[in-house]
């Protein structure tokens, strides 16, 4: 700690005694280094991290290293490079202050030629300063969730440290700065490349240099001579006007997962002075072109002219203490590819490592890339430092083909002037090649959430509602929706003390199954698990049954969106795809890479060619989220009772074609669907009545109606007499319809639970189905009238639960198979 160093100058002296210091992990954080040294109990386990003395780490720390310059450094200039610190650092070499890095995207490239000694030891000392609090958004740019969120704990030290690579490099007099390769596609048969880079003369003398780029595959070579004054920098540009070889015929395009191969190119840049290489760099890129629209107020993404139906997931921290490094990113991203995802949202931009983007490039995973602003209506302490880091991020990452969207703010718009600055930065330093979406859940998006488990039918109905978003609700493009996800038993016991296994107690809350993750609603998760699979008698049974719920819920989320593909659904990303901390919420694979039921549910639903069942309408559809048409496919349905015997009355087979980017209905399973009207003649009450009685809406007649006074917040409810299964309502609106209204249920007519809401009511008959719920009272609650009179209903019919045919057991199974014209299996699915 800085406080423990009485003489900072001594730290910078050779031979300084560091025997009492802690070995630092670089890249890494201060707290992670202390944990690795065994000076703190395992923070993954129990409530250990909550018992750490925060004051011990919430302060500035010194890093120190001694090094020798490599003997093979035979060029004139030696550079000391920093790729990232959190949050701020003062860099000293051999007692000389080289500079200060401010913000975790701020790169440091220090010319230390005249500071280092090449024939002895050098002392590097770095004073790392903790982020300012509160982090959101005052402390930004930083890892905002380091102060704790509803899925990860407060990390002592707020993940301060040297968080990215530190290395020496050796060059000649002339160096290259931030090469930038842009690609455009007049057609998919022809690509046009443009290249820009800065060339810097680091010496005081005028120099003549030659810059060459070589693109592979294809061995495309381009070159230009440049003359530079002493200590000058110049921008070079290469494009088809003077370098026709940058027009590439039949290019190998970069495609997202499911739409084609994620082909990559590399360009090796060299700058030579006097025919000697002064510096070389290699840049990996992909030939692709993104485009976008917001037709019908819904955000759509296209790549290479093809619409992409987005199936993806959010990432929070890659690991809550920044211990995910190198090849581990490849594992994480590959698991997303194996789930058939095509996008990851880098939530709040808290994944900063180059290896993440490289893995997404390789695996064909697009990135929705946030900046570091949460919905709090405040600005960072230093908006100019923030803006500098925005530019740094764009320059560092713009060559990655995986980046599809830049996003300004999580669940709001950046406060002025940041939104305008971000937009201009993207136009200037990314050429407008990627879209800037200022708000993560509005302006063409359908809100955030919900984040808890529901009956599968919920996701197919007109009520997969999100918070905020655009008034025209629907499926649309949803950047966050999720559920609690209990891990498998073998993972659970790795982080939970034995005495807290069962029954559940407060220790579970430390791992986010309780009030600490209220949005995950552990109570509803429990209720669905018990109702669907029976009450568990211990932790092993609970974990086992939870996997069935995890499969069922996560599969239904994606299938609900696929069921409305392009009408109006265009994309869905669950909250979240991976786990940064051992928890029981919002994950597909867990912290230990064990695959939960959520993984298998998502993997099934997101396969490129997928057969699925709508549990509300009983329609069977095939979703084709590829760039390829399929013909002569066969869909097959079989239904089995609990005894394993097939019920032949429901067997169906049909042949059909599946065009690219469609969801085609191929058949309907003939389950009984006529629901009983259970409200006829039942007592009915209203907030007001004009020229009619509330009972006129439940008398079964088509020529009598209830009407309210002229006001918005009016209601009508029916008393069914006792609790019974309710599965929907059928409204017949007169010309004075409800434009926005809710359907609510209650056991006591005092506390009401919402089961449906719409902002798009219309005159006429509207049948609304929702997951069955036991209730005595059912209410229509008006929010906004569609006409200048009050609300008026010819009929308010309450519908009972789904009927079950006599030949079917209460629990029965549906098996779906999709084969090609030669009988090869393409997709298989199941339900119970």
Predicted regions: what they are:
Residues 63-65, 106-110, 232-238, 662-667, ...:
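Short strand-edge motifs at loop-to-beta-strand transitions and within beta-strands
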Residues 1-81, 140-164, 171-172, 295, ...:
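Extended carbohydrate-recognition surfaces in non-catalytic/accessory domains of CAZymes
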Residues 197-202, 506-680, 800-832:
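Carbohydrate-binding surfaces of carbohydrate-active enzymes
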């Amino acid at each position: 700690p800085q406080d423990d160093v009485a003489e900072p100058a001594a730290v910078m002296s050779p031979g300084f005694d560091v025997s009492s210091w802690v070995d630092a992990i670089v890249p890494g954080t201060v707290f992670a280094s202390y944990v690795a040294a065994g000076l703190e109990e395992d923070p993954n386990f129990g409530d250990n991290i909550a018992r750490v003395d925060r004051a011990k780490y919430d302060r500035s720390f010194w890093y120190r290293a001694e090094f020798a310059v490599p003997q093979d450094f035979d060029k004139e200039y030696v550079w000391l490079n920093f790729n990232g610190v959190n949050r701020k650092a003062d860099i000293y070499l051999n007692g000389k202050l080289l500079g200060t890095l401010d913000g975790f995207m701020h790169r440091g490239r220090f010319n230390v030629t005249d500071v280092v000694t090449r024939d002895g030891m050098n002392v590097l000392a770095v004073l790392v300063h903790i982020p300012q609090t509160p982090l959101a958004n005052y402390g930004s740019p930083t890892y905002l969730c380091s102060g704790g969120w509803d899925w990860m704990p407060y990390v002592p030290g707020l993940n301060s440290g040297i968080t990215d690579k530190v290395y020496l490099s050796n060059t000649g007099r002339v160096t290259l700065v931030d090469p930038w390769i842009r690609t455009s596609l007049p057609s998919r048969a022809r690509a046009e490349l443009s290249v820009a880079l800065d060339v810097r003369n680091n010496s005081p003398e005028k120099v003549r240099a030659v810059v060459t780029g070589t693109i592979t595959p294809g061995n495309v070579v381009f070159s230009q001579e440049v003359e530079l004054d002493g200590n000058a920098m110049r921008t070079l540009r290469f494009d088809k006007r003077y370098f026709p070889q940058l027009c590439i015929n039949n290019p190998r395009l970069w495609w997202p997962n499911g739409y084609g191969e994620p082909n990559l190119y590399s360009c090796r840049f060299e700058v030579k002075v006097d025919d000697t290489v002064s510096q070389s760099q290699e840049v990996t890129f992909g030939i692709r072109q993104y485009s976008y629209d917001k037709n019908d107020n819904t955000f759509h993404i296209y790549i290479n002219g093809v619409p992409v139906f987005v199936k993806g997931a959010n990432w929070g921290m890659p690991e809550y203490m920044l211990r995910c490094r190198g090849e581990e990113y490849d594992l994480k991203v590959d698991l997303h590819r194996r789930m058939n995802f095509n996008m990851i949202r880098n939530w709040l931009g808290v994944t900063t490592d180059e290896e993440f983007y490289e893995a997404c490039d390789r695996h064909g995973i697009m990135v929705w890339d946030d900046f570091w602003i949460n919905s709090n209506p405040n600005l960072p302490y230093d908006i100019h430092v923030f803006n500098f880091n925005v530019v740094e991020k764009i320059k560092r990452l713009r060559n990655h083909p995986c980046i599809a969207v830049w996003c300004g703010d999580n669940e709001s718009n950046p406060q002025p002037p940041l939104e305008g600055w971000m937009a201009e930065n993207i136009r200037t330093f990314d050429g407008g090649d990627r879209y800037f979406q200022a708000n993560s859940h509005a302006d063409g998006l359908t809100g955030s959430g919900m984040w808890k488990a529901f009956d599968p039918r919920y996701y197919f109905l007109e009520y997969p509602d999100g918070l905020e978003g655009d008034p025209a609700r629907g499926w649309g493009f949803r950047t966050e929706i999720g559920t609690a996800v209990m891990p498998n038993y073998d993972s659970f016991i790795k982080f939970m003390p034995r005495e807290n296994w069962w029954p559940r107690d407060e220790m579970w809350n430390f791992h986010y199954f309780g009030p600490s993750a209220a949005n995950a609603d552990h109570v509803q998760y429990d209720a669905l698990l018990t109702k669907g699979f029976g009450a568990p008698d211990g932790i092993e049974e609970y974990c086992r049954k939870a996997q069935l719920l995890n499969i069922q819920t996560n599969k239904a989320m994606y299938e609900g969106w696929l069921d409305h593909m392009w009408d109006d659904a265009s994309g869905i990303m669950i909250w979240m795809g991976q786990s940064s901390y051992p928890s029981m919420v919002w994950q597909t694979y867990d912290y230990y890479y064990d695959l939960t039921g959520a993984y298998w549910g998502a993997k099934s639903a997101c396969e490129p060619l997928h057969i699925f069942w709508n549990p509300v309408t009983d329609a069977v559809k095939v979703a084709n989220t590829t760039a390829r048409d399929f013909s002569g496919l066969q869909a097959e349905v079989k239904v089995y009772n609990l005894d394993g015997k097939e019920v032949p009355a429901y067997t169906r087979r049909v042949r059909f074609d599946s065009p690219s980017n469609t969801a085609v209905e191929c058949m309907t399973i003939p389950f009984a669907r006529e629901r009983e009207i259970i409200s006829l003649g039942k007592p009915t009450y209203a907030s007001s009545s004009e020229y009619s009685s509330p009972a006129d809406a439940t008398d079964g007649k088509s020529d009598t109606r209830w009407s309210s006074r002229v006001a918005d917040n009016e209601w009508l409810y029916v008393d069914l007499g006792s609790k019974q299964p309710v599965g929907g309502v059928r409204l017949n609106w007169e010309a004075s319809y409800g434009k926005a209204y809710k359907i609510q249920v209650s056991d006591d007519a005092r506390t009401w639970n919402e089961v449906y809401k719409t902002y798009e009511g219309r005159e006429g008959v509207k049948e609304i189905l929702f997951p069955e719920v036991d209730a005595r009272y059912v209410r229509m609650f008006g929010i906004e009238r569609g006409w200048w009179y009050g609300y008026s209903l010819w009929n308010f019919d309450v519908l009972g639960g789904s009927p079950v045919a006599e030949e079917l057991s209460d629990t029965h199974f549906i098996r779906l198979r999709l084969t090609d014209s030669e009988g090869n299996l393409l997709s298989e699915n199941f339900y119970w």
